[in-house]
């Protein structure tokens, strides 16, 4: 960045996307400050790295900064944003700052409605194993390094590209991956056609020497391929895909498959993450790694070393033969994939506690949510996590639970108070069960409490 920018302030610095950029900037030597509503493990980490953290938003927090960075969750009436605008301090979206970091490197941007965090984490791991030493900014904690960001010395920056508000169009990646396109964020987009058009724009921002990596198994991506003007490779289980998986096997946490490229056998890939959707994420990663000339043997070794991502089928504990898992899945497609992974990897009763995320998403995808839980043997719903949204009349977790029950789901319970979910689980779980907490809000706390209480009963 131009030398006159020295102090950068993040409004909502504790968010997983904001904190990653802040950490990279701290490691680059910039003075970084930020505010959030509460102290967390993330804010404490940034403070330990030299960041100045304010708890609560106040006008005086931005008195001596050069630029203010905001996420899509921060509104114009935020006192720090108001103060910055009055002082004529630039206020920029998170994606613009990420684009600035990407401008200094060759960017690898992973986009898609689902699978971004896992795929970004896989790519970061394999590139590091291949000696490329990338800078990484991920929307989840990479278990192998204990954080979601890292400043590397190599030429590449690997980052998640957030499509939720169209701001990923500010990025200009050298390699763009699109894992899938699905109906989501319909509070911002008019319809699926507008979402597809935005992804076409994103893909075509790749330079003439770059590459797009596209999942052919996704129908919406297949629809837009004729509109892609840049060099691309496809991947999937389809026989028409450039990178293809065969002989897929799932046993517990272990997934393995045989990889092929344009009819040529590459070899077997094995990694510790369940689910057919993660086979696709792995194929995307192979496509990126081979574009960067990483030998396939090193790709194989990287996958064997891959330790997964926080809140993506993350085991919180196993007590009395009851496995407690947490997963970020909050869209019907993600929920189906996660539950299918659990059923495919284990022959165990599946107890699911789901916290819907955002009123707008629950409204727009209500009927899809109704049919997303058929793999759950027992389903518990708790109140919607608002994520800053105001309630929408008639859109509640209770009404969703009732509708799910009417559609044939046999064991569905609505519990308004999230804190009461744990006590309910304690009364119904038994040895052999898998308990999954699902949602992008704070439902993960239920799983952690459950593990502690199960330990206390020993």
UniProtKB/Swiss-Prot annotation:
GO cellular component, as recorded: cytoplasm
Gene Ontology MF terms: ATP binding; UDP-N-acetylmuramate-L-alanine ligase activity
Reaction equation(s) it catalyzes: UDP-N-acetyl-alpha-D-muramate + L-alanine + ATP = UDP-N-acetyl-alpha-D-muramoyl-L-alanine + ADP + phosphate + H(+)
A GO biological-process term: peptidoglycan biosynthetic process
Enzyme kind, highest EC tier: ligase
Chief site of localization: cytoplasm
Enzyme Commission number(s) from the entry: 6.3.2.8
Residues that hold ATP according to the record: 112-118
Biological pathway: Cell wall biogenesis; peptidoglycan biosynthesis
Protein localization: Cytoplasm
Keywords, sorted A to Z: ATP-binding, Cell cycle, Cell division, Cell shape, Cell wall biogenesis/degradation, Cytoplasm, Ligase, Nucleotide-binding, Peptidoglycan synthesis
Pfam families, A to Z: Mur_ligase, Mur_ligase_C, Mur_ligase_M
Family, per entry: Belongs to the MurCDEF family.
Function of the molecule: Cell wall formation.
Stated name of the protein: UDP-N-acetylmuramate--L-alanine ligase
Organism: Geotalea uraniireducens (strain Rf4)
């Amino acid at each position: 960045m131009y030398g006159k920018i020295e102090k950068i302030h993040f409004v909502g610095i504790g968010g997983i996307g904001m904190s990653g950029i802040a950490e990279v900037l701290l490691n680059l030597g910039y003075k970084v400050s930020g505010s959030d509503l509460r102290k967390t493990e993330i804010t404490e980490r940034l403070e330990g790295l030299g960041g100045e953290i304010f708890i609560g938003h106040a006008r005086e927090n931005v008195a001596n900064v050069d630029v203010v960075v905001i996420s899509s969750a921060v509104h114009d009436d935020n006192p720090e944003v108001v103060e910055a605008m009055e002082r004529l301090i630039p206020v920029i979206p998170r994606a613009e700052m990420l684009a600035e970091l990407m401008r200094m490197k060759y960017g690898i941007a992973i986009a898609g409605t689902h699978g971004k965090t896992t795929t970004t984490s896989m790519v970061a791991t394999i590139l590091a194993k291949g000696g490329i030493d990338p800078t990484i900014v991920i929307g989840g904690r990479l278990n192998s390094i204990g954080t979601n960001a890292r400043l590397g010395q190599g030429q590449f920056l690997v980052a998640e590209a957030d499509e939720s508000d169209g701001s990923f169009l500010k990025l200009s990646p050298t390699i763009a991956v699109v894992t899938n396109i699905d109906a989501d964020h319909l509070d911002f987009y008019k319809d699926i056609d507008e979402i597809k058009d935005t992804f076409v724009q994103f893909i075509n921002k790749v330079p003439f020497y770059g590459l797009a990596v596209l999942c052919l198994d996704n129908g919406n991506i297949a629809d837009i391929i004729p509109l892609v003007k840049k060099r691309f490779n496809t991947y999937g289980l389809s026989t028409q895909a450039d990178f293809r998986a065969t002989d897929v096997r799932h046993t517990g946490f272990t997934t393995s498959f045989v990889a092929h490229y344009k009819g040529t056998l590459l070899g077997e890939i094995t990694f510790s993450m369940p689910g057919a959707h993660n086979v696709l994420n792995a194929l995307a990663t192979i496509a990126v790694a081979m574009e960067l000339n990483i030998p396939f043997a090193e790709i194989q070794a990287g996958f064997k070393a891959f330790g997964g991502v926080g809140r993506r089928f993350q085991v919180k504990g196993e007590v009395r033969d009851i496995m407690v898992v947490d997963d970020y899945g909050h869209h019907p497609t993600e929920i189906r994939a996660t539950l299918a992974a659990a059923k495919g990897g284990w022959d165990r009763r599946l107890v699911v506690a789901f916290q819907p995320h955002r009123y707008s998403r629950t409204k727009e995808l209500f009927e899809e949510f109704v049919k997303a839980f058929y793999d759950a043997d027992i389903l518990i719903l708790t109140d919607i996590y608002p994520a800053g949204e105001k309630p929408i009349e008639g859109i509640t977790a209770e009404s969703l639970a009732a509708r799910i029950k009417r559609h044939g789901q046999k064991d569905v319970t609505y519990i308004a108070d999230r804190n009461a979910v744990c006590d309910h689980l304690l009364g119904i779980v038994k040895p052999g069960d898998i308990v999954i907490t699902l949602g992008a809000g704070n439902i993960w706390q239920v799983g952690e409490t459950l593990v502690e209480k199960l330990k206390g009963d020993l």
